[in-house]
Amino acid sequence: MLQAIYNETKDLMQKSIQALSRDFSTLRSAKVSVNILDHIKVDYYGTPTALNQVGSVMSLDATTLQISPWEKNLLKEIERSIQEANIGVNPNNDGETIKLFFPPMTTEQRKLIAKDAKAMGEKAKVAVRNTRQDANNKVKKLEKDKEISEDESKKAQEQIQKITDEAIKKIDESVKNKEDAILKV
């Protein structure tokens, strides 16, 4: 019974850490990632469709991305979607592909993006703490319903705190690594 609560708590906290990693993939660091385009939708025959589902997106070098649409008639639509997304770059359409040339980041931009990474980390910590609170409430309910003793309840809450501390430590490490990658020139 308590083991099920521990396992569920670990799973939920792991999902929060994975969500943080996905959020980090949308932040630009020294090298431009194709994930920076993940949120861009293209009007594909009247349906908003993810950019990576209407063409291939690849990184040519540290500051250049190339989009090769599977249908050439989508070039203009992809170009328009990128301009509307306001990601700080103008698409370069050569009739076959679209190239995005990202300028090198300034120190100020790096600091702002590092600040965003820290905010994402704080959001993940809040999610982890909410998971801890839910788990502790389940344990307290078991104690109240006389299914476990007060000592078992205290030990269970201590175990949940250990699980929480591990998750917070992983989040802090991820944030530190991301900040270092962003601030590295």
Swiss-Prot record:
Annotated GO CC locations: cytosol
UniProt keywords, alphabetically: Cytoplasm, Protein biosynthesis
Annotated InterPro entries: Ribosome_recyc_fac, Ribosome_recyc_fac_dom, RRF_sf
Cytoplasm as UniProt keyword: yes
Ranges where the record places region Disordered: 127-158
GO-annotated molecular function: ribosomal large subunit binding
Annotated localization: Cytoplasm
GO biological process: cytoplasmic translational termination
Record-stated family: Belongs to the RRF family.
Protein purpose: Responsible for the release of ribosomes from messenger RNA at the termination of protein biosynthesis. May increase the efficiency of translation by recycling ribosomes from one round of translation to another.
Protein name per the record: Ribosome-recycling factor
Species of origin: Helicobacter pylori (strain G27)
